[in-house]
A protein has these predicted regions:
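Sec-dependent bacterial lipoprotein signal peptides
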Residues: 1-13
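Bacterial Sec signal peptide processing site at the extreme N-terminus
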Residues: 12-29
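Compositionally biased, intrinsically disordered linkers/stalks adjacent to structured regions
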Residues: 13, 26, 123-152
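Flexible, low-complexity charged segments
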Residues: 14-19, 34-38, 150-152
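Short beta-strands and strand-coil junctions in structured, solvent-facing domains, enriched
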Residues: 16-18, 49-50, 68-70, 145-148
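Short hydrophobic beta-strand segments
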Residues: 25-32, 58-60
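N-terminal targeting signals for Sec/Tat export/insertion, comprising classic cleavable signal peptides
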Residues: 31-46
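Surface-exposed short loop/turn segments
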Residues: 45-46, 50-55, 60-103, 109-132, ...
Length: 152
């Protein structure tokens, strides 16, 4: 009985899941750098694939260079733990009207070792994880703003 009441309450408030399978008509413009290519590909996959420049919504993203901070040190002073942080600012437009203008940041920690190959692999993995976090944050905000726009 409780489940039925909950179902009726959710249905009456016009609940609509954010990722309900609807394809969103968003063109994601090119983003500078290799990390930008990865971010653009990840965003395009969230929006149902690549869209043409004449799509209803246009998303312009600017991705800053990664910032690396030391987080842990050995007694000898060598760094053993680092954090990489990426920040992306974006503007979502419906034609010429700006409907969202914000920035998102994401960070990931990784082990920094003395071996160059292992250290580079850890760094690259942390950057990729950070890009996917940014993609999740930006796509969630964009889809929410689009749904608000279409419900007005």
């Amino acid at each position: 009985m409780k489940k039925l009441i909950l179902l009726l309450m959710v249905a009456s408030c016009s609940f609509h899941p954010v990722f309900s399978g609807d394809k969103t008509d968003v063109y994601v413009g090119p983003i500078r750098g290799i990390n930008g290519i990865e971010l653009r590909n990840s965003l395009n996959s969230k929006f149902g694939g690549i869209h043409e420049q004449n799509a209803r919504y246009n998303l312009t993203v600017t991705l800053d260079d990664p910032i690396t901070e030391y987080k842990a040190f050995e007694r000898a002073g060598d760094a053993t733990w680092q954090e990489v942080k990426l920040t992306a600012s974006y503007v979502l437009k419906d034609g010429d009207k700006v409907i969202a203008n914000s920035s998102e940041s994401a960070s990931e920690s990784y082990t920094f070792v003395r071996y160059l190959v292992a250290s580079n692999a850890s760094y690259n993995n942390a950057v990729m994880n950070t890009i996917h976090q940014l993609s999740e944050k930006i796509s969630m905000r964009v889809i929410t703003e689009i749904q608000k726009q279409e419900n007005q």
